[in-house]
């Protein structure tokens, strides 16, 4: 498989983008989707004009998280005139704060959710095939102290009693994995589980606590860039259906009879339209959204907060290698840690919250996660200073009376609001990241039935974004990248970096001859950032830094980089000097409050390049002082 000329659009480069006369600079792959390429470079103003011209549509999806986006795509694939609105940025709520696992849910077997596990494993296997650029295998290790812990608790659950939280022994885990392997057999993509005895466990993992005598190894999967996958689903949906339209920073303000009033959160403009059906996909905010729609706040959601840490710990990274360690702490809470962007992703907590607004990983939660890791790796020193980044999100779980949060179902359901109003409202309750496609398909089928329309196209085997035409196997991948490097005059190293970020979608970009690297972040180039700004529906600096790039998550973000990115974004997004500085200030406040990234930390990460080589901050003054203090 080799790249061939296609239909790319380099208009985003403008007069300063360099560009290339080589047709290979705008290429697609043989074997890709039959859909036309996404509409590249559609500005927010143009999108709003298209929305104003609509008047009446078939379906309005409220909420731009992964489940709302999935429903939007499923409806677009059927040719439905569907609009999706998100009051913040796409993928900015719980969808941006998962454990980065694409998994069947081994723990859910304890709750008897066999159907959910079976569905999750099938969807995991499909994502490995349909989104191989972002979803990859994750060998997972379960450390075990003994053979029989948890046996009585499992028996109590089987007999209808309430189990006592606690550790699981080798026997229970072995039985669970046997069932897990059995359910994963359909469209199998990964190896079956294995067990290690005392000697092998201590030889292979000497950093484990001395009380750990056994280990189980099985395979699940992980996702590297969940936010990007969501954006690709939107682009694919809009390519499949010219009427489909998704807009961020546009929220539902109220429903007046059959007229939905939308508010642009950036300008305050009000836009109205009429929909035959509304899909409430606002996740943890479903009940609040229903209050806007009908004046009655429902009680469908009982969310729990999950917090995670990104740790800079070379010793822990060496101890676990490429495997995830999946373990129960003293309280019986399942915890995880695995390598991610060269660091350690660790989590998580499970705390009930009354409101999803403004959640963050508190100091007590960070301490809890660190202490849980020490239970398994007592010889590896960890402290607050090792935390590079922290994040939290609220799982939109169905309201339940469970005494233990882990017992609340992670399954999903579609529920029509009752009593019905002038416009029928379908609520998407629950759901986990892995099953977004199945949940979206279920929601779309429910809506199609209400509209009296049949499904015409399945997404089960439909490649996503940069997973289209993806080269199979390491040898084919190397050859593919070599061909791209030769045809575009780009170094193989640069091609490999772009491939890791975008998969085959990198061919929509491909750098021009004067693709200058960022002074403060040479892993990115100025043209690459311009392309992201032009094609990624970026409206704020936070959109760019937190959800179109991974530099905050990976510990690469510095104050210099924030200023350099803001300067690049100002012109295409139409920001004045004052607006640009306000964007910087808002981002710094958000990073400090929600992610534990203080301005002093960002200053300490600044480039060691001489000051004259760094871009001047907007508004003048010192790059190292603006926005701090």
Predicted features, each with a name:
Residues 100-203, 335:
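Dinucleotide-binding Rossmann-like beta1-alpha1 core, especially the glycine-rich loop
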Residues 248-260:
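A conserved short coil-to-beta-strand element within the FAD-binding core of flavoproteins
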């Amino acid at each position: 498989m080799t790249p061939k000329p296609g239909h790319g659009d380099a208009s985003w480069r403008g007069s300063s983008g360099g560009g290339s006369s080589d047709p290979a600079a705008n290429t697609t792959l043989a074997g890709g989707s039959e859909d036309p390429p996404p509409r590249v470079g559609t500005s927010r103003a143009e999108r709003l004009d298209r929305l104003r011209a609509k008047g009446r549509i078939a379906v309005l999806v409220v909420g731009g998280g992964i489940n709302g986006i999935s429903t939007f795509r499923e409806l677009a694939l059927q040719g439905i005139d569907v609009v999706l609105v998100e009051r913040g940025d796409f993928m900015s709520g719980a969808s941006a704060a998962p454990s980065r696992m694409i998994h069947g849910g081994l723990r859910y077997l304890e709750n008897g959710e066999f159907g959910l596990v079976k569905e999750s494993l099938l969807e995991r296997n499909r994502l490995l095939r349909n989104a191989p650029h972002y979803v990859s295998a994750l060998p997972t290790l379960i450390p075990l102290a003994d053979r029989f812990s948890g046996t009585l608790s499992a028996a109590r659950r089987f007999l209808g009693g309430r189990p006592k939280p606690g550790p699981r022994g080798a026997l229970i885990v072995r039985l669970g994995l046997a069932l897990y392997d059995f359910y994963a057999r359909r469209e199998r993509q990964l190896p079956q589980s294995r067990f290690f005895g005392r000697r092998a466990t201590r030889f292979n993992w000497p950093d484990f606590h001395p009380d750990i005598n056994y280990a189980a190894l099985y395979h699940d999967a992980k996702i590297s860039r969940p936010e990007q996958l969501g954006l690709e689903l939107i682009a694919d949906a809009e390519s499949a259906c010219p009427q489909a339209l998704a807009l961020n920073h546009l929220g539902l303000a109220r429903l007046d009879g059959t007229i939905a009033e939308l508010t642009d959160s950036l300008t305050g403009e009000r836009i109205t339209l009429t929909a035959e059906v509304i899909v409430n996909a606002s996740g943890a905010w479903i009940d609040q959204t229903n209050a806007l729609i009908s004046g009655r706040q429902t009680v469908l959601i009982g969310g729990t907060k999950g917090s995670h840490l990104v740790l800079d710990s070379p010793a822990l990274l060496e101890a676990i290698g490429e495997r995830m360690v999946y373990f129960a702490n003293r309280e019986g809470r399942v915890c995880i840690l695995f390598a991610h962007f060269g660091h350690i992703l660790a989590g998580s907590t499970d705390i009930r919250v009354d409101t999803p607004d403004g959640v963050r990983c508190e100091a007590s939660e960070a301490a809890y996660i660190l202490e849980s890791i020490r239970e398994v790796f007592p010889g590896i020193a960890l402290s607050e200073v090792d935390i590079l980044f922290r994040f939290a999100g609220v799982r939109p779980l169905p309201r339940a009376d469970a005494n233990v949060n882990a017992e609340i179902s992670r399954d999903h359901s579609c529920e029509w609001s009752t009593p019905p109003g002038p416009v029928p409202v379908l609520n998407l309750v629950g759901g986990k990241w892995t099953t977004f496609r199945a949940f979206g398909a279920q929601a779309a089928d429910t809506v199609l039935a209400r509209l009296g329309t049949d499904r015409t196209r399945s997404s089960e085997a439909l490649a996503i974004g940069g997973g289209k035409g993806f080269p199979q196997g390491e040898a084919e991948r190397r050859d593919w990248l070599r061909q791209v490097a030769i045809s575009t005059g780009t170094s193989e190293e640069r091609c490999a970096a772009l491939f890791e970020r975008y998969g085959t979608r990198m061919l929509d970009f491909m750098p021009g001859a004067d693709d200058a690297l960022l002074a403060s972040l040479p892993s990115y180039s100025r043209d690459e950032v311009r392309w992201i700004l032009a094609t990624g529906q970026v409206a704020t600096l936070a959109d760019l830094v937190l959800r179109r790039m991974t530099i905050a998550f990976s510990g690469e973000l510095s104050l210099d980089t924030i200023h350099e990115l803001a300067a690049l974004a100002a012109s295409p997004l139409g920001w004045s000097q004052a607006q640009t500085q306000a964007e910087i200030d808002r981002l710094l406040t958000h990073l400090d409050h929600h992610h534990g990234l203080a301005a002093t930390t960002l200053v300490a990460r600044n480039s060691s390049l001489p000051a004259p080589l760094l871009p001047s901050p907007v508004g003048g003054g010192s790059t190292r002082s603006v926005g701090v203090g």
